[in-house]
């Protein structure tokens, strides 16, 4: 309940410090803090999702990335990578190393959009807001994706 977009949060403490508390390990005993993130964003259930895609691109991300609940089979909501939210998560968790997963999903896209800021009430900010309202609009940077597919035997 401490971080995220209230009331769409969990009562669990999901930050790195919560792991220390749960395991009974002193925070000063932790060396590196690895932040693992997807090359795109997903969300389960309701709640604000600034970069959510409601079009064919969102469907493709979901299908290619196999974004379905393991137990329920429920389709996850998919959207472009949100660097504002990622930066906030890095700060809150004290991340020292980043690991990106599911980058291979991007192989099927020529252009990738990344949210680098938000426009809220006519003002642009790269800070994560305490409250996400319908007035928020992501500001995107477009990237051309030219990396070869790791599934291509000629590149292995």
For the regions a language model picked out, list residue spans one by one.
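Active-site loop-to-helix "anion-binding N-cap" substructures in soluble metabolic enzymes
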Residues: 3-5, 19-22
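A translation/RNA-centric and nucleic-acid-associated enzymatic feature enriched
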Residues: 14-17, 81
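Acidic catalytic cores of enzymes that act on phosphate-bearing nucleotides/polynucleotides
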Residues: 1-14
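A glycine- and small/hydrophobic-rich beta-loop-beta segment
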Residues: 22-120, 125-132, 142
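Conserved small/polar residues in nucleotide/adenosyl-binding loops
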Residues: 145-150
């Amino acid at each position: 309940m401490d971080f995220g977009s209230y009331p769409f949060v969990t009562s669990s403490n999901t930050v790195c410090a919560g792991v220390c508390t749960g395991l009974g390990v002193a925070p000063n005993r932790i060396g590196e803090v690895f932040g693992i993130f997807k090359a795109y964003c997903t969300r389960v259930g309701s709640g604000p999702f600034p970069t959510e895609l409601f079009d064919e691109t969102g469907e493709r991300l979901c299908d290619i990335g196999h974004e379905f609940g393991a137990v329920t089979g429920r389709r996850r909501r998919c959207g472009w990578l949100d660097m504002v939210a990622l930066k906030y998560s890095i700060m809150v968790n004290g991340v020292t190393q980043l690991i990106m997963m599911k980058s291979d999903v991007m192989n099927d896209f020529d252009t990738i959009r990344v949210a680098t800021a938000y426009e809220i009430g006519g003002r642009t900010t790269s800070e994560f807001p305490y409250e996400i309202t319908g007035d928020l609009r992501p500001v995107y940077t477009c990237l051309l994706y030219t990396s070869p597919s790791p599934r291509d035997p000629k590149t292995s």
